Structure formats: structure tokens, C-alpha cells
Amino acid sequence: MNSGSSYEAMERYLEKNKKPPKALFISSDATAAGILKSIREHGFLVPGDCNIVTYNNTTFSESSTPPLDSIEVYLKESAKEATFALERFWNAEKLPRKIVIPCSLVIRGSIKKQENNGK
């Protein structure tokens, strides 16, 4: 999904539901750009009315308004593990059942902490 199609999708969502979802996990910054534009054009706040986390932590996440919280993915390590898995496969070696590649959450300001209110 790109910025234009995500904008149109959020426009349809807001037309039907009259308010944005409380939170969105968005798979790319290009998608986030369109969604963020639509939400703001309707007068809703990010964070507040809608909280957003993106995936990949590109420069858009850092430079957008507001700066977006994002999952930092370590592509070098992912590529290295994929290469090792392919080598094992080609050599008819047993492949690991699970490969865990760390990631981290970069906090910038697109998530509003919810008040507990004693609950």
C-alpha cells in the first residue's frame, strides 16, 4: 500500500466510522504518510485520538509531524540469518525450527500514554 491508497482507505474508514481507530500498527512509512494525512485533515489528533506505530524506522518516522514511534528492524542481521539458512538448505543440513532476530521500539511521540484511573 502506498501513501495515496492508504489515504483513500482511511478516508473511507472515517466516512463510515466517523472517528479513527484508537491505535494503528502500520507496516510501512509510505502507508503511514497517507493515513496520517487523512486523520489530521479530519481534525483528529495523533497521538490522542489515534496512536500510531510504524515498522522499519525510516527517516519519515523521524521527520513526520508528529514524529512516529517505530519498530527498528535490523536488516543486516536478518540478511545474515537468511543467508545462513539458505546455505544449510543447499547443503541438505537440518534447518533451525525458529530463528529470532531482535528488534526495538523507537519512542518518538505518536503514542499517548493512557491514564490508569485507578483500574
Task: Show where each model-derived region lies.
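Short beta->alpha junction loops
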Residues: M1-S5
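Flexible loop/turn connectors
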Residues: Y7, E11, E15-G118
